[in-house]
């Protein structure tokens, strides 16, 4: 007997729901796979960033909260470098980042040196910068 509100029989509603549920499950599985791959890419990115930056931070005697600030700066700067922007926009973003972290208490000369160090690490145009460890020696 069809529903008074919708006019659909119970069997039709069950059939519709079961088909809809399967497509939603497939979409969820695919989205979950993509999210896992993206999370793995991000984790690989951070491990490579740490491998490249920690020796520099150790060599310059940076520790404690300053180390966290330098790593935040590196992550933000890498995001800037990964944008598909022209040289002028990147220059301005670099100046803005430099100023932001200078206001947060980082030394101006070391900021310049740190950003130059990040620039010296070879980058690619993928979503995450891949550091070339040979260039850091």
Swiss-Prot record:
Keywords: Virion. GO terms for molecular function: DNA binding. One of its GO terms (cellular component) is helical viral capsid. The keyword Disulfide bond does not apply. It comes from the Viruses. Its main location: virion. The keyword Protease does not apply. Transmembrane segments: none annotated. It is found in: Virion. Heterodimer composed of major capsid protein VP4 and major capsid protein VP5. Self-assembles to form a helical, filamentous nucleocapsid. Together with capsid protein 2, wraps arounds the DNA and maintains it in an A-form. Capsid proteins probably maintain the DNA in A-form by non-specific desolvation and specific coordination of the DNA phosphate groups by positively charged residues. This certainly protects the viral DNA under conditions such as the extreme desiccation of its host. The N-terminus projects into a DNA groove. This is Major capsid protein VP4. It comes from Sulfolobus filamentous virus 1. The lineage of its organism: Viruses, Adnaviria, Zilligvirae, Taleaviricota, Tokiviricetes.
